[in-house]
Regions:
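Thiol/disulfide oxidoreductase modules built on the thioredoxin-like
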Residues: 68-72, 79-125
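Short, conserved active-site loop motifs that form the nucleotide-linked donor/cofactor pocket
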Residues: 48, 74-75
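Structural microenvironment flanking redox-active thiols in thiol-disulfide oxidoreductases
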Residues: 34-69, 80-86
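Single conserved hydrophobic/aromatic residue that forms the stacking wall/gate
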Residues: 1-12
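Active-site-proximal beta-strand/loop segments in catalytic clefts of secreted hydrolases
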Residues: 25-27, 53-56, 79-81, 109-111
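Short active-site neighborhood of thiol/selenol oxidoreductases, capturing the structured segment around
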Residues: 13-34
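Hydrophobic beta-strand anchors of alpha/beta hydrolase catalytic cores
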Residues: 22-23, 50, 96
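Nucleotide phosphate-binding site architecture
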Residues: 31, 41, 105
């Protein structure tokens, strides 16, 4: 079981087959991450599984940030040097991915919002 901020990419694969998940790349230094945080908290409250990738950040600051703003993530991966992000093709934070099984169905660069959710993610979920 993975909890808190961990450094194991295996945590992503522990979810049930055919379940949709979100992977959100975030950091405490990212102003836009704060702007989309309410959206992520709402999705968590709707029952969505959201995996966080804390990107090129300070671990202590990340814990403080989650304590202050709330933690929408079921699991957080700590990517201090950007290795996981590099492997995903991350260009910066925030970025959000829609996952099903081991496949990336959608990638959104920038702030997640209801409009982005409805325009880019819902059609793939309903398909």
């Amino acid at each position: 079981i993975c909890s808190g901020l961990v450094g194991s990419e295996m945590c992503i694969r522990d979810r049930k087959k055919s379940e949709f998940s979100l992977l959100n790349v975030w950091a405490t230094w990212c102003i836009n991450c704060k702007l989309e945080h309410g959206f992520l908290m709402a999705k968590k409250n709707e029952g969505w599984n959201i995996v966080g990738l804390n990107y090129k950040d300070d671990l202590e600051q990340a814990f403080k940030w989650l304590d202050q703003y709330g933690n929408p993530y079921s699991v957080n991966l700590y990517d201090q040097d950007g290795t996981y992000g590099f492997n995903l093709g991350v260009s910066g934070a925030p970025e959000t991915y829609l996952l099903r099984e081991d496949k990336i169905l959608q990638k959104h660069i920038g702030i997640m919002s209801e409009k982005v959710w409805k325009d880019k993610f819902i059609p793939l979920i309903n398909n």
